[in-house]
């Protein structure tokens, strides 16, 4: 396939998020002329910050025409920019990672968010859509954002991670460190490096895929104009 102008839809999943970013980074390295227009759901705006990827998106979408970053919080309820899919502006739309919520909406034709609107308009505009669901079958190993392991935490009155967090994302309660506010966290990792007891962690957790999510993936597989891929890396095989 020959794709030169593509759109990337990101939804609010931590699983597959960094791998998706690495795939698009690789595509840009292979072909600097490739234009990538990024559509970010409201939940993805938060999750990108948690995983330290928010500022890195400019390496994929630098800001020129068809290389903008469209955030749902800035696009309003009507998502006017998705009209580009009807105007022959894109060769393909890739949605990765796609949460179970997004997949269920696609399965039943609901288009009430920036990314699901993009999918709907892409299909109507005969633009090929490729979806990478995070919940396909069985169980998955998902990467979690930074959190405090309370078994390891010593509840120090003087807490280097809390005192040095540049985003003031670590709260205290009754004079000791309490928890990380993930809506403030930028995923920089400074806190993890500063904790002398290795109490701040982020890493793999096994998560069960629900039956309903697997059924919705099967429905999406049968839909006109949409192809389901099992991993972000499968996108590389299309170029």
From Swiss-Prot:
Cofactor binding: number and manner: Binds 2 [4Fe-4S] clusters.
Binding site for [4Fe-4S] cluster 2: 165, 185, 188, 191
EC top class, as a word: oxidoreductase
Keyword Transmembrane helix in annotation: no
Segments forming domain 4Fe-4S ferredoxin-type: 144-175, 176-205
EC number: 1.5.99.15
Cofactor(s) needed for function: [4Fe-4S] cluster
Keywords: 4Fe-4S, Electron transport, Iron, Iron-sulfur, Metal-binding, Oxidoreductase, Repeat, Transport
Gene Ontology BP terms: 5,6,7,8-tetrahydromethanopterin biosynthetic process
GO molecular function: 4 iron, 4 sulfur cluster binding; dihydromethanopterin reductase activity; metal ion binding; oxidoreductase activity, acting on the CH-NH group of donors
Enzymatic reactions: 5,6,7,8-tetrahydromethanopterin + A = 7,8-dihydromethanopterin + AH2
Pathway recorded for this protein: Cofactor biosynthesis; 5,6,7,8-tetrahydromethanopterin biosynthesis
Entry keyword annotation includes 4Fe-4S: yes
Function description: Involved in the biosynthesis of tetrahydromethanopterin, a coenzyme used in methanogenesis. Catalyzes the reduction of dihydromethanopterin (H(2)MPT) to tetrahydromethanopterin (H(4)MPT). Ferredoxin may serve as an electron donor.
Protein name: Dihydromethanopterin reductase (acceptor)
Organism for this UniProt entry: Methanosarcina mazei (strain ATCC BAA-159 / DSM 3647 / Goe1 / Go1 / JCM 11833 / OCM 88) (Methanosarcina frisia)
Top-level taxonomy: Archaea, Methanobacteriati, Methanobacteriota, Stenosarchaea group, Methanomicrobia
Gene (name only): dmrX
